[in-house]
C-alpha cells in the first residue's frame, strides 16, 4: 500500500469536464483526452455503456409518495413495446426491462440526482446500479455494480482481482490501495478520506461507467439521465421490491 504520497491527478474533477458548464453538451476536448488516459479502450467501453440504455440506477426513496408500480417509477407511455415494467420481482434481464426514455418526470429525476450528490444526503442514500448483460458477454445474468465499495460482479473484474492476489499474494493485496498524506477531494475509487483503490490495477468498464455517474459531478449525472436520457433512474420505496432487487442478483 503506497502511503504518504500526493494524488497526482484528480479523476473526479477531470471526468466532471465530460460535459460543458451548462450540462447540455459533451466537451469534445475532454472526451478525446479520456480516450487516451484509460488503457485498452476502457473509456470507450464505459462511455458506450452509458449510451446504450443498458444501465439502470435504483435509489431507495422511502418518502416518495408518488412512486408507481409498487415503488418503481416508469412512465407507461414511454416503455418500449418489447419491455415490461420492473415492478414486483422483475429486474432488467433480457426481454424484461424498463426502457423508459424519460424514466419518470423531469422533476423527479432531478430530485433523485440531487439526493445522490447533496453533501447532507449522499452518504445516507442507498442506491444500486444494475447493468443488463449484452449479447457479446458470456453470462446473461444482470451485472451488479457497487461503486462505493469498488466492486463489480462481472467476469472482467473477477479476473483482474484474482489475478493480482494469485500472482503477488499479500503484496498484490497491498498494491490494490493507495494512501495519501493529505485528504483529497477526488472521489474516484475512494475508500475513505485518505485511501483510494488503485484504479490502474482494479477496474472494469462497468465500474468506470458507474464512477462517471456517481463520483464526478451532478451535471454529469443529469446529462445522462435527463438530457441524453440514456441511463434509467428509478426510485424504490417498497422494502419487498428493494429486497427482490438483491435476491434476483444472487440468483
Swiss-Prot record:
The keyword Transmembrane does not apply. It comes from the Eukaryota. Its main location: nucleus. Residues 83-105 are annotated as: Disordered. One of its GO terms (cellular component) is nucleus. Keywords: DNA damage, DNA recombination, DNA repair, Nucleus. It is found in: Nucleus. One of its GO terms (biological process) is DNA repair. Plays a role in a RAD51/RAD54-dependent homologous recombination repair (HRR) pathway to repair MMS-induced lesions during S-phase. Required for error-free repair of spontaneous and induced DNA lesions to protect the genome from mutation. Belongs to the SHU2 family. This is Suppressor of hydroxyurea sensitivity protein 2. It comes from Kluyveromyces lactis (strain ATCC 8585 / CBS 2359 / DSM 70799 / NBRC 1267 / NRRL Y-1140 / WM37). The lineage of its organism: Eukaryota, Fungi, Dikarya, Ascomycota, Saccharomycotina.
